[in-house]
Regions:
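Conserved alpha/beta-hydrolase "acid-adjacent" motif
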Residues: 273-279
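Conserved hydrolase catalytic core segment
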Residues: 148, 152-179
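Short, surface-exposed "cap/lid" segments of acyl-processing enzymes
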Residues: 56-61, 65-97
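N-terminal cap/lid segment of alpha/beta-hydrolase-fold proteins
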Residues: 28-57
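Conserved acidic catalytic loop of the alpha/beta-hydrolase fold
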Residues: 127-143
Length: 329
């Protein structure tokens, strides 16, 4: 049995009860956290890590889960958000309590990472991930890890998985888009393509952050989450890079499914306007690895991990990541 398979086996059998128990365990088990830095040439990239308990010499290895943020918000507001009085919204906390060693990073020009003259397109994001991998391997001992990307972060993750398949064990793509055909969100965004090409940054203010929660199906998220996200993100300013917007409105597809060799979970909220069901079904059908799942979640839109039904999202991801390894025929 491979190391990756044995790690998945440690988590096999966990189901929705375990996920919900993790949600309620906040008071008893506060994850340990640490900060790190990776270097991509002159660019310094901020990494953040959470797990239950500090690392100890000789401990059993834990499965590593790396979370990849999208176009408009940096890593910790995306995946480690606190919403007072509203329950658990930190994806890092949830999966740390499920036994994972959870990592994320700010891409170039986001959050705490270096500011440059670039526009932080998808290719740049994949290069960021490549720069982060030696740090994760050094600190965890893991040569392979699970990766989950959301929205343009899913594109970054898929491109990286295609470029370096030896690094990625299981791959989760949420709020993903393939060709962009049939996407009302991208059609609307394309109207501003000339402006995105003319500047490496765009306005990302409180109103724009709120629109993430309302543009597809209002009511699928608590708007208190939008306010908490804006509070957490706007400390980094009201500008964010345009590169992923240019790519998603003029350069799709940026990855071909045949090039993604890892097992894949493709997960979509039924109201998500970033991609049509037909577009995603086309991508899914062409994935070469037979170990793949396509999950559609009802009463959900683009921001699945911020939604009212986020526990269903946690469950779908955990079920996929903890899948027992297949027995070859």
């Amino acid at each position: 049995m491979t190391k990756g398979a044995s790690r998945r086996g440690l988590l096999a059998g966990a189901a929705i009860g375990g996920v919900l128990a993790a949600q309620g365990a906040a008071a008893e088990e506060t994850p340990w956290s640490a900060e790190y830095w990776a270097e991509k040439g002159p660019v310094r990239l901020y990494l953040f890590r959470k797990r239950l308990g500090a690392p100890r010499a000789g401990e059993a290895p834990r499965p590593v889960l790396f979370l990849v943020h999208g176009s408009s918000n940096s890593a910790r507001p995306s995946f480690d958000l606190t919403v007072p009085g509203k329950g658990e919204y930190s994806l890092m906390n949830v999966f740390a309590r499920l036994g994972y060693d959870v990592w994320t990073m700010d891409h170039e020009n986001y959050g705490r990472s270096s500011r440059t003259e670039g526009n932080s397109d998808i290719a740049s994001g994949a290069a960021d991930l490549a720069a982060a991998m030696p740090v994760v391997a050094r600190e965890t001992g893991a040569a392979r890890l699970h990766m989950m990307g959301e929205s343009s972060g899913a594109l970054r993750a898929a491109v990286f998985a295609a470029q370096d398949p030896a690094r990625v064990d299981r791959l989760v793509l949420t709020a993903f888009t393939y060709t962009g055909r049939g996407s009302p969100t991208l059609a609307e965004r394309a109207r501003r393509l000339d402006a995105f090409r003319a500047s490496n940054t765009r306005l990302r203010d409180r109103a724009m952050i709120r629109s993430i929660f309302t543009r597809d199906m209002p009511g699928t998220s608590d708007m208190a989450v939008a306010e908490a996200l804006a509070d957490a993100e706007l400390v980094f300013g009201d500008q964010t890079p345009t590169g992923t917007y240019v790519d998603m409105t003029s350069k799709l597809p940026v990855v071909q499914p045949e090039d993604v060799k890892a097992p894949v979970l493709l997960i979509r909220g039924e109201h998500d306007g970033i991609a049509s069901m037909a577009d995603l079904q086309d991508f899914f059908g062409r994935l070469p690895n037979g170990d793949k799942q396509f999950v559609s979640l009802s009463h959900a839109a683009h921001a699945l991990h911020y939604g009212l039904n986020r526990a269903q999202f946690w469950h779908a991801v955990q079920a996929f990541l903890s899948m027992p390894p297949p027995v070859a025929a």
